[in-house]
């Protein structure tokens, strides 16, 4: 029979301790890696996630309205330009939008409301899933309401900068010279808050699915920015990290609406500056197959 000598027993014990320690360390590393990766990623506001959920229709069928309406189809009216005219128009439109910048220094000079109306009507021409048009544009001009919006936003933004966003994100923003203090929310003559409707309501009170509501509203936001630039106004896009629910309640918006983006709108102040950032050239953003 094989007998374990004291030396051999000691070696075996040391080996077993080493194996267990390494196994325990590997387990801890596996547990910590996802947490570290999560902390390195930008913080995600759950309120901003697209809430299109077809399964919900099957689970709560009685609450949802199926679309049965018939829509007449009519001939499409189209203006076709000569090729040279197409090139000229496309180049001029590009040059116009290439001048668009995120401006954080906004004058308190009054903006014609007819211009705001037209800009929002232009945004409302955006395509949407099943033509549900799941957007609501809230226009705020009242100084007291604007100031309260600023207070709510700055309270949450301070937490974002100090805790939620993480050091990498905050470092990446340093070149833009931004922080949680947003004076332009008071000075801008108009604030536009853009809500996505996660579902709608039929005439009988039943819910209507708004397919791809966040993508649809995001397209409308892009057209909105282009229309502002075309009208000679400036803005800076702001995402409502964690202040969306509070602002929704403050503005008395219904529970089916979620704040997607809000923008101060006006003319640039005389002392306005912007970071001198280049845009990617065409060969870095386009692939032809």
UniProtKB/Swiss-Prot annotation:
- Coarsely, its chief localization is membrane
Subunit details for this protein? Homodimer.
**Where along this sequence does the record place binding of FMN?**
100-104, 128-129, 237-239, 279
EC number(s) on file: 1.21.1.1
Instruction: Specify the protein's topology with respect to the membrane.
Output: Single-pass membrane protein
Which residues take part in binding 3-iodo-L-tyrosine?
130, 157, 161, 182
Q: What residue stretch is flagged as signal peptide?
A: none
Entries under Pfam families matching the protein: Nitroreductase
Coiled coil region boundaries: none
Residues that coordinate or bind 3,5-diiodo-L-tyrosine: 130, 157, 161, 182
What's the protein name?
A: Iodotyrosine deiodinase 1
Give cofactor(s), names only.
Answer: FMN
Q: Which reaction does it catalyse?
A: 2 iodide + L-tyrosine + 2 NADP(+) = 3,5-diiodo-L-tyrosine + 2 NADPH + H(+); iodide + L-tyrosine + NADP(+) = 3-iodo-L-tyrosine + NADPH; 3-iodo-L-tyrosine + iodide + NADP(+) = 3,5-diiodo-L-tyrosine + NADPH + H(+); L-tyrosine + chloride + NADP(+) = 3-chloro-L-tyrosine + NADPH
User: What tissues express this gene product?
Assistant: Detected in thyroid (at protein level).
- This protein's UniProt keywords: Cell membrane, Cytoplasmic vesicle, Flavoprotein, FMN, Membrane, NADP, Oxidoreductase, Transmembrane, Transmembrane helix
Q: Which InterPro entries match?
A: Nitroreductase, Nitroreductase-like, Nitroreductase/BluB
The entry sums up its family as follows: Belongs to the nitroreductase family.
- Span-the-membrane segments of this chain are 1-21
Q: Name one GO molecular function term.
A: iodotyrosine deiodinase activity
Domain of life of the organism encoding this protein: Eukaryota
Task: Give the GO terms filed under biological process for this record.
Answer: thyroid hormone metabolic process; tyrosine metabolic process
Which species is this UniProt entry from? Answer: Sus scrofa (Pig)
Gene Ontology cellular-component annotations:
cytoplasmic vesicle membrane; plasma membrane
What is the annotated localization of this protein?
Cell membrane; Cytoplasmic vesicle membrane
State the function annotated in the UniProt record: Catalyzes the dehalogenation of halotyrosines such as 3-bromo-L-tyrosine, 3-chloro-L-tyrosine, 3-iodo-L-tyrosine and 3,5-diiodo-L-tyrosine. During thyroid hormone biosynthesis, facilitates iodide salvage by catalysing the oxidative NADPH-dependent deiodination of the halogenated by-products of thyroid hormone production, monoiodotyrosine (L-MIT) and diiodotyrosine (L-DIT). The scavanged iodide can then reenter the hormone-producing pathways. Acts more efficiently on 3-iodo-L-tyrosine than 3,5-diiodo-L-tyrosine.
